[in-house]
């Protein structure tokens, strides 16, 4: 597991996004990682020193103040702090010219390999089987809603199929007749 692009993902965690639904999902997963560690015994590498959001321009300040209002609506902790507190939290940053500083105490990052393996441990604890190095050639939904997953190693009958194909997720979804609007892109970080 995690031999594709997962192992080097930035894995930043924060609760706010321009979309309300994605904000709720991100906020939920920030809590989930700690629960997942406790439940499975597998470390997710959760590190939450907090995140600072800085505004140098009027437009960015306006955007951060909108984010703070959304955070309040969603019940998230995202608030303005003064320069003194920001310097205490991050003494290496030069805050000259900064108009507004917001702080998200729960912001941080996780270990993407640890998270993946914690999900795998949790799934196995609940009876899931993970078939690595087993290409799927077809999926056939049965009348009762279960699935036959066809592979070169034989067919697998299962009540659920989880598409964890990452970069190849769109192609795997097509095997089930699903058009997944997923487009892999190359990026630098």
Language-model regions, residue ranges each:
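Dinucleotide-binding Rossmann-like beta1-alpha1 core, especially the glycine-rich loop
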Residues: 10-89
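Residue-level detector of anion-binding/catalytic polar loops
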Residues: 77, 129, 179
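Short amphipathic alpha-helical segments
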Residues: 7, 66, 173-177
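A short, glycine/Asx- and small/polar-enriched loop/turn
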Residues: 59, 90-98, 140-148
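Glycine-rich FAD pyrophosphate-binding loop
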Residues: 1-6
